[in-house]
Amino acid sequence: MMCEVMPTISEDGRRGSALGPDDAGGELERLMVTMLTERERLLETLREAQDGLATAQLRLRELGHEKDSLQRQLSIALPQEFAALTKELNLCREQLLEREEEIAELKAERNNTRLLLEHLECLVSRHERSLRMTVVKRQAQSPGGVSSEVEVLKALKSLFEHHKALDEKVRERLRMALERVAVLEEELELSNQEALNLRDQLSRRRSGLEEPGKDGDGQTLANGLGPVGESSRRTAELEEALERQRAEVCQLRERLAVLCRQMSQLEEELGTAHRELGKAEEANSKLQRDLKEALAQREDMEERITTLEKRYLSAQREATSLHDANDKLENELASKESLYRQSEEKSRQLAEWLDDAKQKLQQTLQKAETLPEIEAQLAQRVAALNKAEERHGNFEERLRQLEAQLEEKNQELQRARQREKMNDDHNKRLSETVDKLLSESNERLQLHLKERMGALEEKNSLSEEIANMKKLQDELLLNKEQLLAEMERMQMEIDQLRGRPPSYSRSLPGSALELRYSQAPTLPSGAPLDPYGAGSGRAGKRGRWSGAKDESSKDWDRSTPAGSIPPPFPGELDGSDEEETEGMFGAELLSPSGQADVQTLAIMLQEQLEAINKEIKLIQEEKETTEQRAEELESRVSSSGLDSLGRYRSSCSLPPSLTTSTLASPSPPSSGHSTPRLAPPSPARETDKTNHVPKDEAGVPRGEGPAIPGDTPPPTPRSARLERMTQALALQAGSLEDGAPPRGSESTPDSLHKAPKRKSIKSSIGRLFGKKEKGRMGPPGRESVSLAGTPSDETLATDPLGLAKLTGPGDKDRRNKRKHELLEEACRQGLPFAAWDGPTVVSWLELWVGMPAWYVAACRANVKSGAIMANLSDTEIQREIGISNPLHRLKLRLAIQEMVSLTSPSAPASSRTPTGNVWMTHEEMESLTAATKPETKEISWEQILAYGDMNHEWVGNDWLPSLGLPQYRSYFMESLVDARMLDHLNKKELREQLKMVDSFHRVSLHYGIMCLKRLNYDRKDLERRREESQTQIRDVMVWSNERVMGWVSGLGLKEFATNLTESGVHGALLALDETFDYSDLALLLQIPTQNAQARQLLEKEFSNLISLGTDRRLDEDSAKSFSRSPSWRKMFREKDLRGVTPDSAEMLPPNFRSAAAGALGSPGLPLRKLQPEGQTSGSSRADGVSVRTYSC
């Protein structure tokens, strides 16, 4: 663009105008015109320049946006593509490495196959001769005949398996390689497509950038303004950026080309891998063919070997036959030669003998004179030889006879052993069958006995119910007679009233008779009250009485099948009913219409008598249907479980008017009476309240008036009378069912044995709940004791479902007191354990042994006496009582054996002395109370028997933490391990049942038991000695783990003292274990060996502790080393400590305590012998250790 310059305006115009006004005016006009034209032209150029600038700015903005988008696309696309290409390159490298590894493996496999084939050829060439001679060696049974074809077969088999596995590997790798090649080809195609797309985009971007650049240059040249220059600079920058991007794209292309070359190289390598794989497959096929050829050659060799073996066998047979013939000939030759030599020697000998004979003949001729003497000597010798031969023959015959007898005896012994074995087997089978038959017959007899007892009890209850019903019927008959007499008396009064004048028929309004009967029953609200209308009054009264009678009879019919027992009530009927009837009749007689209704009154009385007769019939029918209702209720209760018991209790707590159907029935329409008056309480009821268990707790509910006011309408006089009669019946039944005097819970033990057998009568619900208790009752002599006040005492005492919460704490205290009384009675009488009855055994299990509630309930159901409990075997305990845990069975067996040994008449005296045992006789109790009278102290049996003194809770909660072994508490608590069982736990039970795997912890437990033995299992003595040694260094044997930690903390080693928690270190271990020294304690305290100062301090204080607080003494030879006895593993073997073998640990003798204590009397651990006060040193009973028997 050309830039036009405006002409300059001269400043001398004003001067010139003054000189020439015309010229000046013309110039000014021209100047103005030129200025205006120039202005218009400049305005147009300005507009054009502004438009161009706006378009250039718009284009610049668009180019900037495009540049940003391109940069974003490049920044997004190129790094991702580059990363993808690098990933693909890495994958290709990994695949190359895998291919190289596969090639190396294939080469190694090929080398292995070549080596195997060479080995096979060597074996075949080496053992060719041995293969041929194998059969010969086998037949000759040479010791070095190891068959070499086995190696050849093994080599062939291994070669075949190797080629098979190699073929599978090659196929698998080929498949994986093909899959990878396919994936790589797909990725390569995708990368090629993306590269083409990028090239297209770059070409499009270049074309788009070049066109706008040309347009922008033209505009700037046309306009020639400054902003257009700026746009040109910006486009130049954009072109530079584009050039840079082109360079980057070129670089990317180069990289892509490199990657493509690498991909081609990879493909070539993959092709080479494929070719090598093919070669490997060909080699594999060749090897397989070689293998087949080798197998065929092997078959040919085997056939050749078989033919050679056959030939060899035939040749061997021929050779053997030839050898035999040669041997025979050689033997014959040798024999002939020997015969010839023998004949020559014989001839020589004969010649010598001939010479000798000649000489002897000459000598005999010389000695012929002495021949008779020699003959006599020869005869004697011949006789002696004959005698010796006879004796020898006799000896041989005797030996033969003895051998024959010995054989016969051996045969008889074998037959006897066989017979003994057969007899043993037969006896075992017979004993098993007899046991089975006895158990089955026992079960059948027990079932039969239970059925008979149940039938007998039902018979007794029914007979007593019938007797009570007869009594009730007699009472009703008496009431009927009384009513008849009353009716006669009223008839007489009516007759007298007929004879009086009419003016005396009504008394004054304010008289006493009017006031007395002011509360008489009224008519319903709907009935008209017409005192002077006779007909209407009669009709109203008749309707009212008939309605009352019908409704009351309906009420009785609805309430009787409910099965609920009415509340207790006095048996005598008071005069309230008579007063009510008098009130009714008097009100009618005083009315004006009552004078003429005498017949109506008589009819009404007759109807009342008929209603009474109907009630008697209903009572009899109810007695007959009692059993049916009891069975129905039993089925309902057994099906509903605990809910039925709650419903039973809730229904028993209400009067009969509020139970079942009565609650749901509407009020009688014609009962216009108010609530009847309650009967006064009888003296029997008062004594029952004060001296006996309340009836509502004993299973018979007590209805005292209306229990829930406002819920039901007031009953009619007839229904109230029926309720009173049924209440009297229930009261009698409840009193007979209790079977005890009013103060039965406080009866003395002497009266327990003198009390006669009482029969019990049960109502429907009482019989229903009584059937469940038949199997749990003890002997008849103990029935009043075990069921002292309530029929459900035993079930509530050990109720695992928590039903005991329904009763108050007073009932539980009474039950515990009753059980303590049972045990006191057994203690006072000195009864043996076999003579204890069922309730006493159950009380002993619950209070003394401390068995759980479910075991106590099982024993109550299955154990009826102490004899049954004492004779239970281990399997019977598991089967009958259901105790599957072996430690629970051990607990029960030990408790039973302890009680049997304590209560037996042949028990040693040491077990019944105050110092030797907590079990005391009556005489010892009296002597002990007499000795404590000056101190004014009461010593009860609970304090002396000390129930639960050292039970499993004490062992788990107190004793184990004191030993430093609280981590085993849960296992000991689950196994119910008490102090009685501690001495009888073997290693297997400690490891498996109690999970005590650490041997040091078992040693710690052992020394804790030793401490208890030395203290004679006296818990109070243990606690007293621990309290005394709490602040002093004395009596280390009773120190607990906490006390030892406190002692360590007091030494200044507080940071190490916490390491003794759950370590098993306690005072008995320090005092009784001779092998435990300060180094063991330092190891348990985890004091490092570098801390020599702390170890020296511990050594010094430990020696002080041992010398001051224990019986251990320092060795005289060395100043700072203790005397060491043999190892505890050798000294305290478990069999020696327990006194029994592990096999005999299941069944322990009754005197297991003394045996176990005697076994512990080893030289390393001397026990303190505790003698009773009243025994002398020379007595035989004081020789052994008197061990205090405890109760847990």
UniProtKB/Swiss-Prot annotation:
Annotated localization: Cytoplasm; Cytoplasmic vesicle, Secretory vesicle, Acrosome
Compositional bias of kind Basic and acidic residues: 201-217, 547-558, 623-635, 685-699
Induction trigger: Down-regulated by tamoxifen.
UniProt cross-references to Gene3D superfamilies, sorted A to Z: 1.10.287.1490, Transcription Factor, Ets-1
Residues annotated with Phosphothreonine modification: T712, T790
Modified residues (Phosphoserine): S17, S142, S207, S431, S507, S639, S644, S667, S682, S735, S792, S1121, S1162
Compositional bias segments (type: Low complexity): 650-665, 1155-1167
Tissue: Expressed in the head of epididymal sperm but not in testicular sperm (at protein level). Also detected in epididymis, brain, intestine and lungs.
A single GO BP: neurotransmitter secretion
InterPro entries: Liprin, Liprin-alpha_SAM_rpt_1, Liprin-alpha_SAM_rpt_2, Liprin-alpha_SAM_rpt_3, SAM, SAM/pointed_sf
One GO CC term on file: synapse
Segments forming a coiled coil: 26-133, 161-501, 595-643, 1012-1038
UniProt keyword annotation of Ribonucleoprotein present: no
Keywords: Coiled coil, Cytoplasm, Cytoplasmic vesicle, Phosphoprotein, Repeat
Ranges where the SAM domain occurs: 836-902, 951-1015, 1039-1108
Broad class of the protein's primary localization: cytoplasm
Keyword Phosphoprotein in annotation: yes
Stretches for region Disordered: 1-23, 201-239, 521-587, 623-815, 1155-1192
UniProt note: domains: The N-terminal coiled coil regions mediate homodimerization preferentially and heterodimerization type alpha/alpha. The C-terminal, non-coiled coil regions mediate heterodimerization type alpha/beta and interaction with PTPRD, PTPRF and PTPRS.
Quaternary structure note: Forms homodimers and heterodimers with liprins-alpha and liprins-beta. Interacts with the second PTPase domain of PTPRD, PTPRF and PTPRS. Binds RIMS1, RIMS2, RIMS3 and RIMS4.
Family (UniProt): Belongs to the liprin family. Liprin-alpha subfamily.
Function: May regulate the disassembly of focal adhesions. May localize receptor-like tyrosine phosphatases type 2A at specific sites on the plasma membrane, possibly regulating their interaction with the extracellular environment and their association with substrates.
Name of this protein: Liprin-alpha-3
Gene name of this polypeptide: Ppfia3
